[in-house]
Amino acid sequence: MYYLLILVLLFLAELFYFRVADRCNIIDKPNERSSHTKVTLRGGGIIFYFGALAYFLTSGFEYPWFLLALTLVTFISFVDDIKSTGQMTRLLFHFSAMALMFYQWGLFSLSWWWIVIALIVCTGIINAYNFMDGINGITGGYSLVILAALAYINKEVITFVEADFIYTVICSVLVFCFFNFRKKAKCFAGDVGSVGIAFILLFLIGRLIIGTGDFSWIVLLSVYGVDSVLTIIHRLILHENIGLPHRKHLYQIMANELKIPHVMVSSIYMVVQAIIVVGYIMYMDYGYWYLIGTVILLSLIYICFMKKFFRLHQF
């Protein structure tokens, strides 16, 4: 009953946001580097924040420093969706938020170099998640797979967080997918959505890694990770400015050049990541070897795909 109520409230909150976005003209206009062709409401992913907030309010204010951190990144990302903000301003908010999350993790009790590594990894993951949000369904669908995996791990492998937190966030992702995981999306996640859900997943995976002392759990993000890193390397080889928008991710080639429906491409990413997670859980004793093998296999697939189809790319 609790989750049904949460679903209904989040659904109503999303509908209310649509009215606000429509009235305030918070929209995404297509351009030559977009993978969509129609004007669409932007920022629907703000519902992820409300999902986390709902858990915070109903759990006796659990994880207050994390919620404050999520509020910071949600705020600056939402502002960026409305009007472009300066890079230094975004970095200030993001680094402040990560410091709060690290404090919630208890990371400051470890050696300083762990904090440096965590800062680099977290910054990379947040940016990668943001870059990968380019077609209908991919952010919501991929996040749903990871959250489902985390829920299973939390129940069957090791308890690293209160289960209600994961399930409440899942409710928010389901609401978003209802409006986005379709041929003609009602809304896009926006930076507020892609950065927000990335931050939530980082918090959960970080707790899992710290609780187990096993970094190989990062395999939960392997599909996004390989696509993002190899695309950056590819663009550097092409002497491009990696800070500028582009359409060179593997999923973008599939959707734009090969004309594969967005929902189909998103489903492929979901299925591949789900298979990887199932395999990892089955062979958990060989975690790091499995992670290395997964990265190598995904990299080979990426390279072969690009060798065959990148010639079709126009921008």
PLM feature segments, named:
Residues R19-C24, K183, L236, I303-F315:
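Membrane-interface capping segments at transmembrane-helix boundaries
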Residues F75, V175, A274-G279, S299-Y302:
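Aromatic-anchored segments of alpha-helical transmembrane domains
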